[in-house]
């Protein structure tokens, strides 16, 4: 299913369906969210991640963390994945043998977007045309940092090496992007659950 040069991205609705935590750690992490809605969305996103990964590898799902906190499959290190969610919609990106990062943001009013861009974006992002443009660039930049494994810890400069970033259609009120190590991939979009 995962061919070289492809990244598969699943759109996952987080607003319906019952889920239970798979591990004690997952339950403890979910409990830290401030509202029942946020806890349920977290659990649904991680349940979908497990189902999706079990569909691309027959190895048991044994998760571990890289030194900067990016999760990976210790049981199938050739499978690379990333998860992002915003306001009831998640994206799960999966690739083989290349690092991958994904980000999604619901487009919403954000009066301080220019100050945020100035603080976090690398030089050259001074020409934003509005909040929609800000979120397009934000998701591209965040996906790149997540693929690299640095997240906002690495903000202020693009990660070293060759990376490709592709925008993903997540719906009219969202901006989304996927980033991979190396050449621009063929992005294959899937629905999951009610998004199917």
Predicted segments, located by residue:
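Core catalytic alpha/beta fold that binds nucleotide/phospho-ligands
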Residues: 1-196
């Amino acid at each position: 299913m995962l061919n070289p040069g492809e990244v598969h991205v699943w759109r996952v609705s987080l607003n319906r369906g019952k889920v239970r935590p798979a591990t004690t750690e997952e339950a403890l992490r979910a409990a830290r969210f401030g509202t029942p809605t946020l806890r349920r969305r977290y659990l649904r996103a991680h349940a979908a991640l497990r189902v999706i990964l079990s569909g691309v590898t027959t190895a048991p799902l044994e998760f571990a963390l890289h030194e900067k906190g990016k999760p990976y499959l210790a049981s199938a290190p050739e499978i690379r994945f990333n998860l992002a969610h915003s306001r009831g919609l998640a994206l799960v990106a999966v690739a083989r043998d290349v690092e991958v990062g994904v980000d999604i943001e619901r487009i919403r009013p954000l009066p301080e977007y220019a100050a945020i861009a100035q603080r976090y974006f690398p030089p050259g992002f001074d020409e934003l045309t509005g909040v929609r443009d800000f979120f397009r660039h934000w998701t591209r930049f965040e996906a790149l940092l997540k693929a690299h494994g640095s997240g906002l810890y690495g903000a202020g400069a693009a990660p070293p090496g060759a990376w490709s970033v592709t925008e993903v259609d997540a719906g009219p009120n969202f901006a989304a992007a996927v980033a991979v190590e190396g050449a621009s991939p063929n992005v294959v979009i899937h629905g999951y659950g009610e998004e199917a």
